[in-house]
């Protein structure tokens, strides 16, 4: 039985640590499956880059080119998932939905590709709460995908509307040159749209080019600029020497009040929160100037190591999600077996499951509050020692029988005094 419990705990720890990497690998494999599908076609998509005039264009090449680009985008986007970027998660959902619809319509016999795509979509939706980070890498991927799509559209659009320009666009290189010239809004005037359709097309390229450029620059350089501006205004961020401190995981009301109370008593506290970047700023303002907040997943071993788990006094899992609290304790004990753990339980139904992770202290504020209310309404006497005993035992049986007897004995001695 002990071997099974050890295996179960190890498997749980591996799942918590590697689930995001597994998901990124699944998205990457979806891209490879698309490449495998293209490789088996009789049409060579690379021939599309050797076209010199529109008259040489085989429409079958253009029909399959989006599938090739879809595979490229999925492979690139899997990198963003490794950083748990919210933007990468959203783009992956969109790309996989497009791939699923495309495959169902044109290649319905590819059962494995369809099934694996559906599995990855479900996997992404299940882990949606884990992807809340803002990442420069994800912004770079988004910028590359947007720029590549716009370049493809503008180049072959100009080649398709070649007769609407003066002079006429007759080669792929000329169309590519016109696309870059228009997207950058340089406009040398050597190629001028003369037909109505060509002018409307040029307007769409100009607007799209400005939008993609502005969005890309914001996604990539925005976080860097904001960080530099904050340092300029506020000075260097307070860096706490993380030793003999408390680690609080979560941003619940209980967690925030606990942090404030510990700070009032001069204790050093490091907070781990998976809130979005803007909400992290609000949390830091609420906790004060000396707040030491680490953005990230409290189940991630690298985040716990950064928080100084091997040098802390205790780690407190105080989020509103009982499962997340249990995973925090499992991850903490896996990294440092001697660390003291405190776990908050919101739902009494989860108490028996919570006990399996063996935290040092289990607190159940809801059960504690209901017990106090029942005693008050029943007219029972309540003193400070009884309140402490009830709070520490709100998790039902977190101490051994000897510990409970010692607590009761101490309460009697205090009452006699």
From Swiss-Prot:
Determine if Metal-binding is one of this entry's keywords. no
In this UniProt entry, which residues form the Cytoplasmic topological domain(s)?
A: 1-21, 84-86, 128-140, 221-417
Output the InterPro entries linked to this UniProt entry: K_chnl_dom, NAD(P)-bd_dom_sf, RCK_N, Trk_Ktr_HKT_K-transport
What results from changing residue 414 to L?
A: In strain: ECOR 46
TM annotation in the entry: 22-41, 64-83, 87-104, 111-127, 141-160, 200-220
| Annotated consequence of substituting residue 411 to N | In strain: ECOR 46
Q: What is the effect of changing residue 223 to S?
A: In strain: ECOR 4
Q: Which UniProt keywords apply?
A: Cell inner membrane, Cell membrane, Ion channel, Ion transport, Membrane, Transmembrane, Transmembrane helix, Transport
This protein's GO CC annotations: plasma membrane; protein-containing complex
Question: Has the keyword Lyase been applied to this entry?
Answer: no
Give the Periplasmic compartment stretches of this protein: 42-63, 105-110, 161-199
Q: What SUPFAM superfamilies does this protein's entry cite?
A: NAD(P)-binding Rossmann-fold domains (SSF51735), Voltage-gated potassium channels (SSF81324)
Q: Where is this motif: Selectivity filter?
A: 185-190
Result for mutant: residue 5 to T: In strain: ECOR 52 and ECOR 60
* UniProt-recorded Gene Ontology molecular function terms: identical protein binding; potassium channel activity
Q: Which Gene3D superfamilies match?
A: 1.10.287.70, NAD(P)-binding Rossmann-like Domain
Where in the cell?
Cell inner membrane
The reported result of mutating residue 406 to K is: In strain: ECOR 46
Record membrane topology? Multi-pass membrane protein
Subunit structure, as described in the record: Dimer.
Family statement: Belongs to the potassium channel family.
What this chain does, per the record? Answer: K(+)-specific ion channel. May play a role in the defense against osmotic shock.
Q: What is this protein called?
A: Voltage-gated potassium channel Kch
Q: Gene encoding it?
A: kch
